[in-house]
């Protein structure tokens, strides 16, 4: 689990996301509270439940990006789902419990990676010995049995040195390696994914592990053998227990587009993909036990972060019980022209930086001037104001249109330099931005 302070978390998010300080503070506090809870005594820890968050803001202002970056920072089981993908239990479509099953799969994978990392050094030693055995097979006795090998013979040490220095990387050897089982793919009817997962696991277990002699280069053999030896050193049952503990105490679920499951007006008949989904989400958020292929998972201490644009619906259109389960409300502001300018230059791997790097691969030098960047930001903001406001995503459209000519002709213009200044931007985008009908279809 990440031990970063709220200030450090916000600072890290600032490297990728412009503005939205309230939302950053809220998720930073929530993430730190996960760590604080784990420092408490067991009797008190059980009583401390997470304060779930509802992020409200127009499209393209950074809600999903905050979740994406948070997942990388947290180093805990994290899953992002779209609320619109689910339907009420009993109807065709995904059930909300599959969120916890998927989160548990993520946790098992994460725990497995961490466990493999811990035993990597020992696995590398064992893999090295197996490669040396293949290079220097031990002599056999009269009965055809391999004699005890000399671990520290001078020849073996010479080969070990060469192996570690990479001098033998391209030499081919024949080794016994575990053969990956043929995957049994079963098409799942909607709502029956769990049953098909169990069937697939059953078929794979029936097949068992088989080994096969293969000829491969030493560098590839080492990689395969390290994985094989590491897998032997790891206790799979312990891994599952750790993963379930990790999900129950550190898991985070990000539910996007929650506004799309609000009830709109008076609807007669069952509203299976809206209010029904909200009612199914309630027990998950409040705390229930979900059956997964790895074991039973309690959701009492999983943190839920929901987000939505709420352009048509309002947060008050959510059913009251669900509103009560999302006590922390954070509003994200719409982006201004100045925000667009900062988005183009300040974040790590900004859009302008990406285009410059892409063109460099063709030996074309592209430079964005300050007035050119301001003109691009103004153009994107103006189109958002006059047509549909899609936030920072508009910058992708505008930049792609602006760079169209350079990108297409780059192969013939190797060695040339292009300066994207205000005049260049006006010449390419001026007419489109001013003509509302054109910008609706092209930008």
UniProtKB/Swiss-Prot annotation:
Location in or out of the cell: Cytoplasm
Gene3D superfamilies in the record: 1.10.8.60, P-loop containing nucleotide triphosphate hydrolases (3.40.50.300)
Keywords from the named record: ATP-binding, Chaperone, Cytoplasm, Nucleotide-binding
Pfam families: AAA (PF00004), AAA_2 (PF07724)
Main localization, broad class: cytoplasm
SUPFAM superfamilies attached to this UniProt entry: P-loop containing nucleoside triphosphate hydrolases
GO cellular component: HslUV protease complex
Residues annotated for ATP binding in this entry: 18, 60-65, 256, 321, 393
GO biological process terms held by the UniProt record: protein unfolding; proteolysis involved in protein catabolic process
Quaternary state and interactors: A double ring-shaped homohexamer of HslV is capped on each side by a ring-shaped HslU homohexamer. The assembly of the HslU/HslV complex is dependent on binding of ATP.
Known role: ATPase subunit of a proteasome-like degradation complex; this subunit has chaperone activity. The binding of ATP and its subsequent hydrolysis by HslU are essential for unfolding of protein substrates subsequently hydrolyzed by HslV. HslU recognizes the N-terminal part of its protein substrates and unfolds these before they are guided to HslV for hydrolysis.
Entry similarity comment: Belongs to the ClpX chaperone family. HslU subfamily.
Protein name: ATP-dependent protease ATPase subunit HslU
Organism encoding this protein: Vibrio cholerae serotype O1 (strain ATCC 39315 / El Tor Inaba N16961)
């Amino acid at each position: 689990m990440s031990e970063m302070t709220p200030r450090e978390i916000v600072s890290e998010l600032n490297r990728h996301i412009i503005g939205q300080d309230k939302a950053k503070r809220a998720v930073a506090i929530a993430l730190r509270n996960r760590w604080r809870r784990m420092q408490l005594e067991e009797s008190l820890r059980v009583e401390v439940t997470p304060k779930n968050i509802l992020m409200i803001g127009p499209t393209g202002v950074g809600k999903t990006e905050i979740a994406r970056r948070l997942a990388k920072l947290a180093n805990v089981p994290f899953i992002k789902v779209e609320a619109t993908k689910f339907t009420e239990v009993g109807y065709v479509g995904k059930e909300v419990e599959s969120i916890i099953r998927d989160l548990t799969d993520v946790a098992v994978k994460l725990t497995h990676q961490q466990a493999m990392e811990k035993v990597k050094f020992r696995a590398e030693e064992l893999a090295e010995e197996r490669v040396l055995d293949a290079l220097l097979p031990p002599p056999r006795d009269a009965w055809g049995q391999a004699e005890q090998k000399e671990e520290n013979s001078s020849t073996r040490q010479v080969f070990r040195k060469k192996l570690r220095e990479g001098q033998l990387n391209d030499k081919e050897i024949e080794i016994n390696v575990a053969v990956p089982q043929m995957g049994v793919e079963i098409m799942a009817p909607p709502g029956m994914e769990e049953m098909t997962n169990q069937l697939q696991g059953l078929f794979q277990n029936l097949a068992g592990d088989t080994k096969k002699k293969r000829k491969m280069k030493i560098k590839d053999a080492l990689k395969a053998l390290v994985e094989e030896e590491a897998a032997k050193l790891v206790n799979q049952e312990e891994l599952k227990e750790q993963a379930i503990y990790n999900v129950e105490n550190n898991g985070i679920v990000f539910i996007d587009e929650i506004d799309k499951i609000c009830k709109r007006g008076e609807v007669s008949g069952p509203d299976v993909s809206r209010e029904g989904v909200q009612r199914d989400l309630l027990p998950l958020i409040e705390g229930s036990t979900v059956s997964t292929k790895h074991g039973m998972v309690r959701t009492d201490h999983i943190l839920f972060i929901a987000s939505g644009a709420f352009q048509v619906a309002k947060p008050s259109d959510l059913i009251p019980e669900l509103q009560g389960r999302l006590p922390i409300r954070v509003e994200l502001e719409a982006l201004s022209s100045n925000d667009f300018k900062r988005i183009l230059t300040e974040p790590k791997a900004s859009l302008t930086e990406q285009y410059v790097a892409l063109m460099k691969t063709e030996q074309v030098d592209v430079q964005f001037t300050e007035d050119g960047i301001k003109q691009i930001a103004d153009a994107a903001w103006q189109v958002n104001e006059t047509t549909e406001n899609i936030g920072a995503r508009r910058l992708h459209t505008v930049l792609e249109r602006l760079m169209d000519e350079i990108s297409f002709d780059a192969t013939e213009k190797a060695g040339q330099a292009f300066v994207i200044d205000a005049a260049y931007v006006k010449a390419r985008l001026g007419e489109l931005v001013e003509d509302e009908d054109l910008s609706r279809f092209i930008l």
